[in-house]
Swiss-Prot record:
Component of the DNA clamp loading complex consisting of tau(3):delta(1):delta'(1). The DNA polymerase III holoenzyme complex contains at least 10 different subunits organized into 3 functionally essential subassemblies: the Pol III core, the beta sliding clamp processivity factor and the clamp-loading complex. The Pol III core (subunits alpha, epsilon and theta) contains the polymerase and the 3'-5' exonuclease proofreading activities. The polymerase is tethered to the template via the dimeric beta sliding clamp processivity factor. This is Probable DNA polymerase III subunit delta. Pfam families: DNA_pol3_delta_C. GO terms for molecular function: DNA binding; DNA-directed DNA polymerase activity. One of its GO terms (cellular component) is DNA polymerase III complex. The gene is holA. InterPro entries: DNA_pol3_clamp-load_cplx_C (IPR008921), DNA_pol3_delta-like_C (IPR048466), DNA_polIII_delta (IPR005790), Intein_C (IPR030934).
Length: 314
């Protein structure tokens, strides 16, 4: 699966091309189909003024001019563009430039402009993940049977970049080890963010039995340590505090180094938790982290006790 239909050569046409989507792995896949990123002048977006200067100073008529590749052009994620942003967009449209936007919903001004070439990177879903894994495995010359692909589809997150990175680990295994599901989980599940999210979701939804069962699954095979989970949860609660008073649509305008879709999901998940409750839980996490590091052998017991206290907060 990819965002584009075929591989094409880059042609000097002085037009703006946009590649967008929430999965950065898919964005890079599309870029490699469109052009050779190494042959471009690569720029990471910081602010509109700096970007405008880079584009304005580009000598379009020089023989050695390279197309510009602008990564994570975040100002084009929002609909209410300022005058300066609109002016920058107009300049980009008259430039030999490729822009990436890490969002499934870029600005309407961009989407509705027929003069801009656009490539939408559709996210990996439950319907497509088997195909994505099969294609990535084929590229890496991994011989995975359908049963193995089914198993991988249950433990890998829906993100091409992560899938490719994890499958590269499997190239180091022998054919016999590839058929051993326990070996696969030991290699691939060092830090299962998807399962951590399941645990935090169960806690927020007050599903006590499910949360305790997930703790057994996460920590007993040693694929994740309790302090790692606590660090993840504390960061999530801090983000929940930070977006507490932000309007849902304004989340996409925040200039934070966090995926806005994750921020919106966190905001929705913790919407019924008060500021005092979130603060108390963060303090409890810090205290528990110290206890666990002093009593490593009791880590699972202490974590289960913490989860039960978590539910008591509600």
């Amino acid at each position: 699966m990819g965002c584009g239909a075929c591989c094409i050569l880059w042609v000097q046409s002085f037009t703006m091309t946009v590649v967008y989507g929430a999965d950065i792995g898919l964005i890079h896949q599309q870029l490699n189909q469109l052009l050779n990123p190494a042959a471009c002048k690569q720029v990471w977006f910081q602010d509109v003024n700096k970007l405008y200067d880079v584009v304005l100073n580009q000598n379009l008529f020089a023989e050695d001019t390279k197309p510009i590749l602008i990564h994570n052009c975040s100002f084009l994620e929002k609909n209410n563009l300022t005058k300066a942003e609109l002016h920058c967009l107009k300049t980009l449209k008259d430039t030999d430039v490729v822009v990436t936007i890490y969002s499934d919903s870029p600005a309407n001004a961009l989407i509705n402009d027929r003069a801009i070439t656009k490539y939408a990177c559709k996210p990996v879903t439950a319907k497509t993940i088997h195909q994505v894994i099969s294609k990535a495995a084929k590229t890496l010359k991994l011989n995975l049977n359908p049963d193995l692909i089914d198993h991988l589809a249950t433990i890998l997150p829906f993100n091409l970049g992560v899938i490719e990175q994890e499958l590269r680990k499997l190239t180091l295994l022998s054919p016999a080890e590839l058929q051993d599901k326990k070996m696969l989980e030991a290699v691939l599940c060092d830090y299962q963010t998807s399962q951590i999210l399941q645990l935090t979701d169960a806690m927020v939804r007050l599903q006590t039995a499910k949360a305790l069962k997930l703790i057994e699954r996460l920590f007993l095979p040693k694929q994740l340590t309790p302090p790692q989970f606590l660090e993840f949860l504390a960061n999530e609660l801090l983000l929940a505090l930070m977006v507490k008073g932000v309007k849902p649509q304004a989340v996409f305008q925040l200039q934070w180094n966090v995926n806005p879709f994750r921020l919106k999901a966190i905001q929705s998940q913790y919407r019924f938790w008060s500021t005092n409750q979130l603060t108390a839980l963060i303090n409890a996490i810090w205290q528990l982290d110290i206890k666990i590091k002093r009593n490593d052998g009791l880590a699972i017991h202490l974590l289960k006790h913490f989860v039960l206290r978590f539910f008591a907060q509600k």
